[in-house]
Amino acid sequence: MKKNFAVFGLAGMLVFTAGGCKKQPPTLSLLVWEGYADPSFVRAFEQSHKCKISAAYMGSSDELVAKLRGGSASNYDVISPSSDVATMIASAGLAAPLDLSKFPSYLQLSERLREMPLVRVNGNVYGVPFTWGPNPLLYDTKTFRQPPDSWTILWGPDLKNKISVWDELSTIYMAAQILGYDKPDPGHLYNLTDEELNNVKKKLIELKPNIRKMWSTGGELTNLFENQEVVAAMGWPLITNQLRKANYPIGETIPKENTTGWIDHLMITSASEHKDLAAEFLEYMIEAKTQKAVADVTGYDPANPQAAQFMTEDQRKSLHLDNVDLYMTRIYFWQQVPRRDKYNEIWNEVKAAQ
């Protein structure tokens, strides 16, 4: 009897223990650009899939690559690499190949973006286009009554300690444009010679007296404008959106030299333990209604043109969706930089210069 009682007691304990444990909802971990996990559109996915979204934000492509290669790749399920590092991440085995049959909205995405080779390696597709846009010149409309027509205004003697630049390689590209290194081939911005890089370095060191602070996050630049510490900077449409919502007098323009820009993809890391859930998240994020919601928050152009049907005419015009092809000619989309280490070396020398 004691033996039977003991077994029954153990079984009862097991039943009680099992019944007393509530299964925790899965957490999908993101490493993405700012604005890509806003509650306004992420919350609906959490509710419908009974999961949690946890997001960490990156300030540059180099930060993303460093984290993936530094042993923390297993901490993340979904990443949003830009067009300068997407191919490298896929080729390095840091992202998982996608089964496109799981993405009903994939064929709705811009054919131009889908057909780019950025995330295609050995016949596999490793990411879905998500958003795209420029790195525009942002300016205080009280200081500049008319939109500045050239990046060279940042070097103006009247702007000492009144501008900000992005702590990222895009600042090198911008200086290279001023020096004419984008002609005749804009792609040359991403493969400059040593001599050209040294000339870029000199040009950027000349800019340093005007730099109040280099920004690394969108929130940081937003604060610099709101605190009236700067009146001009290279920025993101997201920052323009944030400042306009705060009623700050901000303007945004692409100068006559044009500008660089990016195509961001969503990828699933090869180390993810939630690949099925991550795939469902990617599908949700490229659906037309979600793409419209992302544009509301970020001011970025949607990869899914069908998002336009949910927008007002003013929003479509502000995103240049009425003339996308012409708008894209003003943007030199980031490409892989073969000598990225050399570019970073030059940029670090600029930052260290007195």
Task: Give each language-model segment a name.
Residues 1-28, 354:
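Short, low-complexity disordered leader/linker segments with a strong preference
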Residues 324-354:
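Conserved C-terminal helix/tail region of periplasmic/extracytoplasmic solute-binding proteins
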Residues 80-86, 90-226:
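Extracytoplasmic ligand-binding site segments that recognize negatively charged/polar headgroups
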Residues 86-88, 234-249:
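A ligand-binding cleft/hinge motif common to bilobed small-molecule-binding domains
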Residues 260, 269-331:
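Mature extracytoplasmic/periplasmic domains
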Residues 198, 203-207, 244-270:
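Periplasmic-binding protein-like
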Residues 136-143, 178, 263-274, 293:
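A bilobed periplasmic-binding-protein/Venus flytrap-type ligand-binding module shared by bacterial periplasmic
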Residues 21-89, 222:
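Early extracytoplasmic/lumenal segment of secretory-pathway proteins
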